[in-house]
Amino acid sequence: MNALNQAHCEACRADAPKVTDEELAELIREIPDWNIEVRDGHMELERVFLFKNFKHALAFTNAVGEIAEAEGHHPGLLTEWGKVTVTWWSHSIKGLHRNDFIMCARTDKVAEVAEGRK
């Protein structure tokens, strides 16, 4: 079991440090199914989850929303028929914080038990 999926987010302010290159290299190994994307000049973590239909995709979206609310850290979510794209980044620092990796791992944990996964 991944230690990240047991961790909790810390408050992240605009002056919080982004992950270093060394931290990035270490943390990304713990969430191997996630991709680093660069948008608007900052890094984001993104993964696409496939489902059998819209109902299952929407249920997963809502489950991710629940963990986001509980941690006070919110992703970008795009819900389509049979597909959910989840994107984590720290808006306040315009980049990646340890919180984003924690939430990727927690999203993976939700996906493990999600109904209707392809």
Swiss-Prot record:
Pfam families: Pterin_4a
EC id: 4.2.1.96
GO molecular function: 4-alpha-hydroxytetrahydrobiopterin dehydratase activity
Gene3D superfamilies: Transcriptional coactivator/pterin dehydratase
Keyword Signal among record annotations: no
GO terms for biological process, alphabetical: tetrahydrobiopterin biosynthetic process
Record's catalysed reaction(s): (4aS,6R)-4a-hydroxy-L-erythro-5,6,7,8-tetrahydrobiopterin = (6R)-L-erythro-6,7-dihydrobiopterin + H2O
Keyword vocabulary terms for this entry: Lyase
Leading EC class: lyase
PANTHER family: PTERIN-4-ALPHA-CARBINOLAMINE DEHYDRATASE-RELATED
Family note: Belongs to the pterin-4-alpha-carbinolamine dehydratase family.
Name assigned to this protein: Putative pterin-4-alpha-carbinolamine dehydratase
UniProt source species: Pseudomonas putida (strain GB-1)
